[in-house]
Amino acid sequence: SDFTSTSYAAHVFVIKQLYAFSSNDGFASNLGMQVFTAGGIQTGSSSYQYVHRSDTTNGVAATGQSTGASEIRINTPTQNGTNSHDNRYGAGYVWCYNLAPSKFSHFNIQYSYNKDQSVTGNYVSLTGMGLHEDATGVVGVRFKNDQGAVLRANIYLYGLEI
């Protein structure tokens, strides 16, 4: 089940798994979320793109990466005009549609380190995680990838059902 509920202090907390890399459909649209798979978002002078591991859109290849699971890549192709692995760093958002911010008191991102074999010694570090709501009311899970490499994660929202 996508939902797990448990009672606590007369409140019902709902855990919804928004995204799991074990899903083979790219970005788990069946779980009611959407992710930019090409084009990404613009932050300053850099464009952060979310692409499936097997997706070669915008020249992002899957070579040198582990297989068997989806991956979110954070690319900054405008850094030097290419999709260089060396420039894969920055902040990003995974957008979650149709979620009322008031219904979710907090969230949790579970992730594991995954060495990007195209960048020697480069591991993922997540900081600055938090919920983000844009001007149109779209709620996103914000993460920051300090060191580049490939991000693997299971994203959950824990919320107070009201």
Task: State each model region's role.
Residues 1-162:
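Surface-exposed molecular-recognition determinants
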